[in-house]
Swiss-Prot record:
Cellular compartments annotated: Endoplasmic reticulum membrane; Golgi apparatus membrane
Described function: Mediator of sterol homeostasis involved in sterol uptake, trafficking and distribution into membranes. Also regulates the sphingolipid metabolism.
Organism: Schizosaccharomyces pombe (strain 972 / ATCC 24843)
Domain of life: Eukaryota
Keywords: Endoplasmic reticulum, Golgi apparatus, Lipid metabolism, Lipid transport, Membrane, Sphingolipid metabolism, Transmembrane, Transmembrane helix, Transport
UniProt topology in membrane: Multi-pass membrane protein
Membrane-spanning parts: 71-91, 122-142, 153-173, 179-199, 208-228
Main localization category: endoplasmic reticulum
Cellular component terms (Gene Ontology): cortical endoplasmic reticulum; endoplasmic reticulum membrane; Golgi apparatus; Golgi membrane
Family: Belongs to the ARV1 family.
Gene Ontology annotations of biological process type: intracellular sterol transport; regulation of plasma membrane sterol distribution; sphingolipid metabolic process; sterol metabolic process
Upper lineage: Eukaryota, Fungi, Dikarya, Ascomycota, Taphrinomycotina
The name this protein goes by in its record: Protein arv1
């Protein structure tokens, strides 16, 4: 157990006085004199908001004071939920793109397949991209930093990837842009780096950043192969442009290729 404010080791997080969650007293950290874990008394909604805001305190609470063999199942369920949201986002964007470009064959060809096949294909791509990224990060942490606990590393990546659910609100309010998915993916990568640095207790942001970046490149290669096999690799039609706009488009393509996922592909 660790203090969420300073990261120092603590003997206990609270003192239990009787039945009910209100009959507890939060322990004080001897190092920083703050409450060791203020999130014990907060509900899931407030904790989720701090996770989206990438606060280091909530990462320490989840990774050091809450994560166990039992709670890791909930983390895996959360990962599956994110994948299901990804399927919804990709599917909705494909339908919008097919409506905007009725003569653009890749989207039309994919959407002409049976609905079950469409869903299973997108679900497979989303699950594979998540699994490949998770395995790559864990293996690289083990090989380069000697990290032993794969559950904590995987949990850190999953919990810090909750920002990926934000584009759902953009779809609901009809502000969905293709560049937004790429921006969100880069925010997720920075969040992963932050969470892994907190987990390992290391300030080597550059080294962990390279680990996350390399894992993202491996994921991009696998996703491109799957998109090529399903005929979705050329789903975004190119638009002619010149000058500064051409440079911006090339820059966007470069950043998108590093974080290629099913979301950024469409």
């Amino acid at each position: 157990m660790k203090c969420v404010e300073c990261g120092a080791e603590v003997d206990s997080l609270y003192t239990y006085y009787g039945r009910g969650t209100s009959n507890i007293r939060l322990a004080q950290c001897k190092n920083c004199k703050q409450f060791a874990d203020k999130y014990i008394e907060l509900d899931v909604v407030l904790i989720s908001m701090d996770v989206i805001l990438m606060k280091p305190q909530v990462y320490r609470h989840l990774l050091f004071n809450s994560l166990s063999a039992r709670t890791f199942r909930n983390v895996v369920n959360f990962c599956i939920l994110i994948s299901l949201f990804n399927v919804f986002l990709v599917w909705s964007r494909l339908e919008k793109r097919a409506a905007l470009f009725p003569y653009f064959t890749p989207a039309q060809a994919f959407l002409s397949q049976p609905i079950i096949r469409q869903y299973l294909t997108l679900l497979l791509i989303c699950l594979v991209e998540t699994t490949v990224y998770q395995i790559s990060v864990v293996l690289l942490l083990c090989l380069t930093m000697g990290w032993k606990s794969w559950t904590s590393a995987s949990g850190a990546v999953i919990l810090s990837s909750s920002t990926r659910m934000l584009p759902v609100f953009m779809v609901i309010w009809d502000y969905d842009l293709s560049i937004a998915a790429t921006v969100v993916e880069w925010v997720v990568l920075f969040s992963n780096v932050d969470a892994l640095c907190i987990l390992t207790g290391s300030r080597r942001y550059f080294k962990i950043g390279l680990i996350v970046l390399f894992a993202s490149l491996v994921r991009s290669i696998v996703v491109y192969i799957f998109l090529h096999l399903t005929g979705l690799s050329q789903i975004q039609p190119s638009t002619p442009c010149d000058g500064f706009q051409h440079f911006v488009n090339l820059l966007c393509v470069y950043f998108r290729s590093i974080t290629l996922t099913a979301q950024t592909a469409v």
